[in-house]
């Protein structure tokens, strides 16, 4: 069972690419260890909005570790301390009670800051439009009847698929 942690959160705030930026500091209390990093930022934003303050702006899309939109620098490391994981797949159990967690945007001339930790990713669109990506020919999918599956295995697979119908 995960325990709750309390920590100091320092987030980068900036109103645009030419604006001066600064860190704002927040004390986060009793955050469950099974909370994802982005969910923790959602909790911060709920607190900011309830207090009449502007929410912290950050990018995200799928929240399933696929798209990479959630890219942040956390404590000076891309995506934080978890090796090979995107920010949305980083859980608060990776941190300790009393930690200071610093959140910053990607810093690159190619990706100017729009606001806080949201960056302009149109440079990626230009690369894709120019054909600057890798594709792999994987062949065609096998015929559905090429691999025989027992009725028991098919029933079990269907039960599992039905169970995760919520998308969790």
Give a label for each model feature.
Residues 1-165:
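Signature of N-terminal electron-transfer/Fe-S-associated modules in redox systems
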Residues 168:
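Histidine/lysine/aspartate-rich catalytic loop segments that bind and position anionic ligands
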